[in-house]
């Protein structure tokens, strides 16, 4: 698979990324592992997730695959923060305190101490 550099960061990403929005929700752990295995065997290394996907379950599935299906250093993981659903209501909060707290939770679910790309999931006109 063709690889691309992410700006001047030195990070090398597969041109195609593996989206995981349904993992832990519509896609069970075994099917997710099969998808991930096929993606990696095809030369992919860029896995995209979010704290909101499956209420964190997508990140948990990826965390469970690290060390069993792939080595952490062999993939680039992107996740997102800033959107939560307290009491079932979509809330956007990009304050520093909220973002850092969400990053800590994502790292715990992903069972890693870093992510390669961390994104704001939605514009917050207040922060």
Name each model feature, range by range.
Residues 74-80, 117-118:
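Non-cysteine beta-strand/loop elements that form the S-adenosyl-L-methionine
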Residues 1-2, 46, 83, 87-90:
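Generic preference for well-ordered secondary structure
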Residues 21-23, 50-52, 80-84, 120-123:
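Active-site beta-loop-alpha junctions enriched in small/polar residues
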Residues 1-76:
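N-terminal binding-site loop/beta-alpha segment at the start of enzyme catalytic domains
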Residues 59, 80, 102:
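Acidic-residue sensor for enzyme active/binding pockets
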Residues 86-127:
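Glycine/proline-rich, positively charged
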Residues 12, 80-85, 114:
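Short, basic/glycine-rich phosphate-binding loops at helix/coil junctions
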């Amino acid at each position: 698979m063709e690889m691309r550099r992410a700006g001047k960061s030195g990070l090398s990403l597969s041109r195609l990324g593996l989206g995981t929005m349904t993992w832990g929700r519509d896609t069970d752990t075994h099917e997710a592992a099969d998808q991930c295995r096929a993606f990696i065997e095809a030369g992919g290394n860029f896995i995209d997730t979010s704290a909101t996907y499956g209420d964190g379950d997508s990140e948990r599935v990826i965390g469970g695959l690290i060390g069993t299906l792939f080595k952490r250093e062999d993939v680039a993981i992107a996740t997102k923060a800033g959107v939560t659903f307290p009491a079932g209501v979509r809330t956007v909060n990009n304050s520093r305190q909220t973002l850092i707290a969400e990053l800590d939770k994502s790292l715990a679910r992903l069972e890693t101490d870093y992510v390669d790309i961390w994104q704001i999931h939605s514009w917050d006109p207040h922060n």
